[in-house]
Amino acid sequence: MQGSTRRMSVMTDVHRRFLQLLMTHGVLEEWDVKRLQRHCYKVHDRNATVDKLEDFINNINSVLESLYIEIKRGVTEDDGRPIYALVNLATTSISKMATDFAENELDLFRKALELIIDSETGFGSSTNILNLVDQLKGKKMRKKEAEQVLQKFVQNKWLIEKEGEFTLHGRAILEMEQYIRETYPDAVKICNICHSLLIQGQSCETCGIRMHLPCVAKYFQSNAEPRCPHCNDYWPHEIPKVFDPEKERESGVSKSNKKSLRSRQH
């Protein structure tokens, strides 16, 4: 199987191995996705020229289209790191998590999601989430059990925990953006720059528009005196740093668990 014989919309062993490993991880940063791609070529088609990542993924997506599955690219809300996740397009509801969680666990996630969406900060405190345990559908759940389930959501990359508070992982945003828009139309927040769903971000104190932190960083990158893109009033928040993939490559360090990635590359 040489590179010259590969055609668009044809899944080779390289593509199949890549897809299988991405499914295992659920979501990966771009740096790890590129490493995974190189690994798959090394195993199955060592002499082939490695396709550009965008072309490689588009090829897979063209085959997956009929199955209503897609590899989607997004960015982390806190620092703008590119991520990729395998997304089920056939359903937009939380039911896509049903294979991994019981009914009462899914309802706990739904309660946590509501708190996160309704909050101004994009976070829901563990205390507030656990206080809703008595309202869950299905089998009764103790607070100690609920704490363990929340950690399971974190391990499966549906939630992120920071200092006792929870927010949505980039995987959850990629998978559930349409569901969130449809279910919480009055509470949902949209970024003024990229117009996609916003969970965490900054807002203008004058007109109220919101921006993702990475969008804030890029928009005000060269502005000595940042002003709101909507009302032109002074932007009072600290401007975050722009994620630099070049520096990331130089350091060779990713936030994700490299050991875990290597252990699953087989």
Swiss-Prot record:
Modified sites of kind Phosphoserine: 251
Highest taxon of the lineage: Eukaryota
Bias (Basic residues): 256-266
Coiled coil: none
Annotated Gene Ontology cellular component terms: chromosome, telomeric region; nucleus; Smc5-Smc6 complex
Compartmental location: Nucleus; Chromosome, Telomere
ZnF (RING-type) intervals: 191-232
Sequence segments annotated as region (Interaction with NSMCE3): 1-102
BP GO annotations: DNA damage response; double-strand break repair via homologous recombination
Region feature (Disordered): 245-266
Catalytic activity: S-ubiquitinyl-[E2 ubiquitin-conjugating enzyme]-L-cysteine + [acceptor protein]-L-lysine = [E2 ubiquitin-conjugating enzyme]-L-cysteine + N(6)-ubiquitinyl-[acceptor protein]-L-lysine
Keyword match Nucleotide-binding: no
Protein modification: Ubiquitinated.
GO molecular function annotations of the record: protein dimerization activity; ubiquitin protein ligase activity; zinc ion binding
Subunit note: Component of the SMC5-SMC6 complex which consists at least of SMC5, SMC6, NSMCE2, NSMCE1, NSMCE4A or EID3 and NSMCE3. NSMCE1, NSMCE4A or EID3 and NSMCE3 probably form a subcomplex that bridges the head domains of the SMC5-SMC6 heterodimer. Interacts with NSMCE3.
Protein family per UniProt: Belongs to the NSE1 family.
Task performed by this protein: RING-type zinc finger-containing E3 ubiquitin ligase that assembles with melanoma antigen protein (MAGE) to catalyze the direct transfer of ubiquitin from E2 ubiquitin-conjugating enzyme to a specific substrate. Within MAGE-RING ubiquitin ligase complex, MAGE stimulates and specifies ubiquitin ligase activity likely through recruitment and/or stabilization of the E2 ubiquitin-conjugating enzyme at the E3:substrate complex. Involved in maintenance of genome integrity, DNA damage response and DNA repair.
Protein name: Non-structural maintenance of chromosomes element 1 homolog
Highest classification ranks of the organism: Eukaryota, Metazoa, Chordata, Craniata, Vertebrata
Gene: NSMCE1
